[in-house]
């Protein structure tokens, strides 16, 4: 009998149930090529396929997550001398120029389109991980996440912790290491109180506005408090910054090049 990846049998994205939709495709939460082993539940084959399909003017949502975090991992290895030569970096989307510390987009995509697809990808992995842990991904309170990540409707804020040190503790560097991110009861409680979920992966910390109404009331104070503990004051430009462009998240870790 063919394996199904279900708990409730109701897709957390489109809300459809068996037999209207099927659940036979293994939905990796973090892409397997990045070392992700966790398999999500209740993501129907149609929605799983949609996240992996390019749309006109943009690469797929899943491709953007993979490209950004592959770059993060490679250049983290480069900056920590695990890898010696930046010319080993290969990407379908980006060309990186070591001498000028600049990059170009290899296709006709705009940086705005790539930024939006990346943001959608981060919210995708959030809800799939949340559902795996809580079995509550169909909760109506996440409708804004579903609209944005799955259907490209509306917008949600994403913030990035910009530090001038490498946060490598508990960060898998090898390309064969198992990669995951945490979803603890404490983190869920913080999310319920502030509207934000904190995602830490490959040494980078993001804050996702997953409950916009709650975030509108308590989010600014939460981010201000987080800045006091998460930022290491070194050069004076450290901040928890709103992501409006891929340049805001320093994919190639150029701030660590001397």
Give residue spans per PLM region.
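Conserved C-terminal region and hinge/linker of Rieske [2Fe-2S] proteins, especially
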Residues: 82-83
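Short Cys/His-centered divalent metal-binding micro-motifs
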Residues: 42-79
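Short cysteine-rich clusters marking metal-coordination/redox-active sites
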Residues: 11-14, 44
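Histidine-centered nuclease catalytic patch
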Residues: 18-40
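C-terminal, charged low-complexity interaction regions
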Residues: 117-258
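Short, flexible, mixed-charge glycine/proline-rich loop motifs
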Residues: 1-8, 33-38
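Short flanking/linker segments adjacent to small metal-binding domains or redox-active Cys/His motifs
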Residues: 86-116
């Amino acid at each position: 009998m063919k394996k199904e990846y279900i708990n409730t049998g109701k897709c957390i994205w489109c809300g459809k149930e068996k037999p209207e939709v099927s659940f036979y495709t293994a939905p990796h939460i973090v892409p397997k090529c990045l070392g992700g082993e966790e398999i999500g539940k209740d993501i129907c084959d149609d929605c799983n396929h949609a996240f992996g399909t390019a749309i006109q003017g943009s690469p797929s949502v899943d491709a953007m997550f993979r490209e950004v975090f592959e770059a993060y991992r490679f250049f983290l290895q480069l900056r920590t001398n695990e890898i010696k030569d930046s010319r080993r970096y290969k990407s379908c989307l980006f060309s990186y120029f070591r001498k000028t510390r600049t990059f170009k987009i290899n296709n006709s995509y705009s940086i705005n389109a790539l930024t939006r697809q990346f943001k959608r990808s981060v919210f995708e992995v959030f809800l799939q991980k949340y559902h795996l842990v809580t079995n509550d991904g169909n909760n109506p309170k996440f409708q804004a996440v579903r609209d944005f990540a799955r259907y490209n409707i509306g917008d949600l804020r994403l913030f990035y912790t910009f530090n001038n040190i490498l946060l490598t503790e508990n960060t898998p560097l090898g390309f064969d290491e198992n990669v995951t991110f945490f979803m603890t009861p404490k983190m869920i409680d913080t999310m319920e109180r502030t509207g934000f979920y904190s995602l830490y992966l490959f040494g980078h910390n993001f804050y996702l506005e997953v409950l916009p109404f709650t975030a509108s009331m308590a989010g600014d104070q939460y981010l201000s408090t987080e800045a006091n503990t998460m930022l290491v004051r070194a050069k004076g430009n450290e901040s928890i910054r709103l992501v409006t462009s891929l340049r805001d998240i320093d994919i190639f870790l150029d701030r660590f090049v001397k």
